Every structure is written in C-alpha cells, then in structure tokens.
Amino acid sequence: MTRLRLPAVNELSYRTLVWLTYRLAATFALGLPLVLLVWSALRREASVLRLLTLYWKVASLMGISMLLLTDQRPLGYLTAVIAPLLMACSVWFWVDLNEELEDLPLWRPLPLTVRLWRWALSGFAIVSVAMTATALGCMQQSGSMDCLAWQEAPKGVHSVVETVFDFLFGGQWTEAVAAFIGYAALVAYVAGLLQWLLVRLPRQGRVAGGF
C-alpha cells in the first residue's frame, strides 16, 4: 500500500524522520552492541558475550537490507521491517541467558548497561518498524521521493565501501555487486533460520546453550 503523497514541507519532515531512524539504528543497533561485545570479551563475561554473539547473528539481516537497498531492490524494504523485530526478540528470547543476566550484580557497569540497552533496543525496534512499514509501498514504486529517502543512507555507505574497496583491491564495488551479495547472504540467513526453527527449537526450546 503506497503512502499518500504529502506537501513538500511534509516530505522534508518525512526525510528527517527516515534519517533519524537510521541514526537510532547506528546508535542502538550497531554502535552500542559493538561496544558491549568488545567490553564483554575483555571482561570475559560469558553470558553477555553469548547474548551479543547471538544478537549479531540475527542483526546481520539489517546489513543485508542495506545491501539490497543500495541497488533499489524491493525485497530490501521488507527485510528492513522484519530485521528490528527479530533483533529485539533475540535479546529477550533465551531463558537461560535471561536468568544468568538476572544473577549478575546490578551495580556492575556491564550488566547494568546491557539491561538498559535491551530496553533501548526494544524501543528502537518499535520506532523502526513503524517507520519502515510506511515504505512497504516502495516495493512496487521505488522511484518516489519517499522511497529515495530510504536509499540515501545505503548509497552513502556504498560510496565509502566503494572507495575503500578500490583503494585496497583495485576493483569495482558496484551497486549490482552489493545487491548480489545481499541476495546470497539472505539465502544463507533464511536457510539458517529455517534450520533453527525446524531442528534446534523443537529440541532445545528457548535455551541458548552453546548456540
């Protein structure tokens, strides 16, 4: 369902909200969990490290969405809606990890930060889904101004990667290559998710174990 066209001022406001969504993602879905991953590795906090490792496996779908949107592939808009939902679920789903985190002293900086981050990530997921859902109409009409707003950040990241790739390898990192890698990664992601849903979940339930 395509979003109704808005006046120029509202289109500018919509673009601002899109960029706000990307900035929130960079903070709560990328930057902070990366810091927590390194922090937990340095402190050798096994439960936190395992939670963050599982989170990054799930969060890779957001990177796949960026690759697909770089080349304006319609599927990227759908995965952009699904990704934050799975990411938020991944930090609350595991019963054993939840219990281990509850046992950690609240006054310690790392456990406290992880707990606050999980709530912040959940809030971001709600905002992100609400925003990305408005772009589902772009799966049929990707050339509108609203759709182009969602493509700006992926194309900006693509430009940086293209420059680095050319400098290091002397090759071309094109939008078509990015989309191809995105599709290949998506196939692997879906295969892994199905394997977990059909094989591992029925056997172990909500226990992370050594996953």
Regions found by a protein language model. Name each.
Residues L4-L32, E175-Y183:
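Hydrophobic transmembrane alpha-helical segments in integral membrane proteins
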Residues W39-L42, S65-R73, T132-G137:
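Juxtamembrane "helix-exit" motif on the non-cytosolic side of transmembrane helices
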Residues L52-Q72:
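A generic, lipid-embedded transmembrane alpha helix
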Residues A120-F211:
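C-terminal membrane-adjacent module
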